[in-house]
Swiss-Prot record:
Divalent metal cations. Prefers magnesium or manganese. The active site is at residues 103, 177. It comes from the Eukaryota. GO terms for biological process: malate metabolic process; pyruvate metabolic process. Its cofactor is Mg(2+); Mn(2+). This is NAD-dependent malic enzyme. The lineage of its organism: Eukaryota, Fungi, Dikarya, Ascomycota, Taphrinomycotina. NAD(+) binds at residues 272, 419. It is an enzyme of class 1 (oxidoreductase). It catalyses: (S)-malate + NAD(+) = pyruvate + CO2 + NADH; oxaloacetate + H(+) = pyruvate + CO2. One of its GO terms (molecular function) is metal ion binding. It comes from Schizosaccharomyces pombe (strain 972 / ATCC 24843). A divalent metal cation binds at residues 248-249, 272. NCBIfam families: PRK13529.1 (NF010052).
Length: 565
């Protein structure tokens, strides 16, 4: 990762080619000398502006769009392929306002309408009809030399942002996640590659759309799918051997098995499984600082046992194991509820591979009449200290369920983290009322504070952007051999223990994304230290803590214009 300094850089372009390069274009900020040298003096208005003047103009243009999120998304996307420095400078100054525009929820609309509103190519498109290792390597080599790419986000678009199978349009989720890597943690955007794997789509709306730009066939599965993915991973390892691989928004049937398959051998990560789990764990750790009770003594019930729910469960288990529990005892503290109720051994035939380690013995619940055990009954039986919602089913955390839980726990920890807000299992004000103001609450979407006994109570957001960018940058900086459970736990612990000055309020369980860069530095530092202690780092990092912190900052990419030579 190049140092974020003011050094001069060599510009290989000139004329209109330079002005059309988002990497090198400065628009009206080119100096008179640069305009002359690079043959663009007649192509720009005579005034020379600062980056801040450009940011101010763009923000005025952005506000003039009005209350049309998708149009704002398109405006910012156009800016990103015109002048990336200006794009990142603008958003970094309005981060909280613009993240919902460039990421969830608005990016979901852009993805759904990808083929209808397509304007310019972004990212790398690999399709299963060209499942040949040599050809895939040739495609990847179009994006640079072996050291040109250090971070890759790859999706097959089956599980996009809660909106499901989006086919080729899923490339935009890889693009958006990369933007957050740069904004929140300083990843060099010129060394990041977003990839979409087009393996067909089962989305009939897209396949029937005459504008659709992807493969018009059923989503491929089985051996052909696995062969294609394996060739893609092999090609990445050969063309960009030092690149860290980030799997994003794969479907329930593939996400965990793919991660389990590749994780022992290559440096890789799945944000939906590990990132979501690590952020939820950080929020739990934050809540446990309030209750002053250890993670290893918690009884945790997860409502919704899909990719996110299982990912959170596995991350909590890993955290408990790191804190000293055996694997079996840690899993014994997790209780999963899915469409068939509390998951028991009798559900083994219909349980996914990810759910099976959490099946409880039927004999442990023999006093329950035959039939499925619903949430309210399960709470009465298990008496959980923590309740997490990942189901996408609004209203499922009922008053009866919350009051039952509050009977057994002095400060119940309740996180309805399904996105968007319309799919939350309960609203924070309902949880607050039904728990008599005792619950510690976090959500998956940004929400205003509660009024609790005349005081403002901040609702923390379990936002993956708080963690995955820093985790990814730490993996890049260390060129880690693998991403270990210890490194993930270090990230969760670091997020939960950043300086309180970075929190929106004293009672907040997680820090404020407004302070993304400072939060990320704290996490990067902790993960690097853990990587070194486990022998996972292949880079000789500074051993002095103060020097390591300086080293991290020096390697951040920042949106600033540098002199050209």
């Amino acid at each position: 990762m190049p140092a974020g300094t003011k050094e001069q850089i060599e510009c290989p372009l000139k004329g209109v080619t330079l002005l059309n390069s988002p990497r090198y274009n400065k628009d009206t900020a080119f100096t008179p000398e640069e305009r002359q040298k690079f043959e663009i003096s007649s192509r720009l208005p005579p005034i020379v502006e600062t980056l801040q003047q450009q940011v101010d103009r763009c923000y005025d243009q952005y506000k003039a769009i009005g209350d049309e999120p998708l149009q704002k998304n398109l405006y910012l996307s156009q800016l990103s392929v015109t002048n990336q420095t200006l794009f990142y400078a603008l958003i970094s100054q309005h981060l909280i306002e613009m993240i919902p525009i460039i990421y969830t929820p608005t990016e979901g609309d852009a993805i759904k309408q990808f083929s209808d509103i397509y304007r310019y190519p972004e990212g790398c498109y690999l399709d299963i009809d060209h499942n040949d290792l040599s050809y895939i390597k040739q495609q990847l080599s179009e994006f640079g030399k072996s050291d040109s790419v250090e971070y890759i986000i790859i999706t097959d678009s089956e599980g996009i942002l809660g909106i499901g199978d989006q086919g080729v349009g899923g490339v935009l989720i890889s693009v958006a996640k990369g933007h957050l890597m740069t904004l929140c943690a300083g990843l060099d955007p010129n060394r990041f590659l977003p990839i979409v794997l087009d393996v067909g789509t089962n989305n009939e709306t897209h396949r029937k759309n005459h504008q659709y730009m992807g493969l018009r066939k059923d989503r491929v599965r089985g051996e052909q799918y696995d062969s294609f993915l394996d060739n893609v991973i092999k090609a990445i390892r050969e063309v960009f051997p030092e690149a860290f691989i980030h799997f994003e928004d794969f479907g329930l049937a593939n996400a965990k098995r793919i991660l389990d398959h590749y994780r022992p051998d290559i440096a890789c990560f799945n944000d939906d499984i590990q990132g979501t789990g690590a952020v939820a764990l950080a929020a739990i750790i934050g809540a446990l600082h309030v209750t002053k009770s250890p993670l290893t003594e918690q009884r945790i019930m997860i409502f919704g046992a899909g990719t996110a729910g299982v990912g959170i469960a596995n991350q909590i288990v890993a955290g408990m194991v790191t804190d000293g529990l055996s694997l079996d005892k840690a899993r014994g503290n997790l209780f999963m509820i899915d469409r068939c109720g509390l998951l028991l051994e009798r559900h083994a035939k219909i349980a996914t591979d990810g759910q099976k380690p959490f099946l409880k013995k039927d004999s442990d619940f023999k006093e329950v009449p035959s039939g499925d055990i619903n949430l309210e009954s399960a709470i009465a039986l298990v008496k959980p200290t923590i309740l997490l919602g990942c189901s996408g089913q609004p209203g499922k955390f009922t008053e009866k369920a919350i009051r039952e839980m509050s009977k057994h726990v002095e400060r119940p920890i309740i996180f309805p983290i399904s996105n968007p807000t319309t799919l939350m299992e309960a609203k924070p004000d309902q949880i607050d009322k039904w728990s008599d103001g005792k619950a510690l609450i976090a959500t998956g979407s940004p929400l205003p504070p509660l009024n609790r006994n005349g005081k403002k109570y901040v609702i923390s957001q379990c936002n993956n952007a708080l963690l995955y960018p820093a985790l990814g940058v730490a993996c890049v900086l260390s060129r880690c051999k693998l991403l270990s459970d210890g490194m993930l736990k270090a990230a969760s612990d670091a997020l939960a223990t950043v300086p309180r000055s970075l929190f929106a309020a004293d009672e907040a369980l997680l820090p404020d994304l407004n302070n993304a860069r400072e939060i990320s530095r704290h996490i990067v530092f902790a993960v690097l230290k853990q990587a070194v202690s486990e022998g996972m780092s292949t880079v000789d990092l500074p051993k002095d803590d103060a020097k390591l912190k300086e080293w991290i900052i020096e390697r951040e990419w920042n949106p600033e214009y540098k002199p050209f030579v």
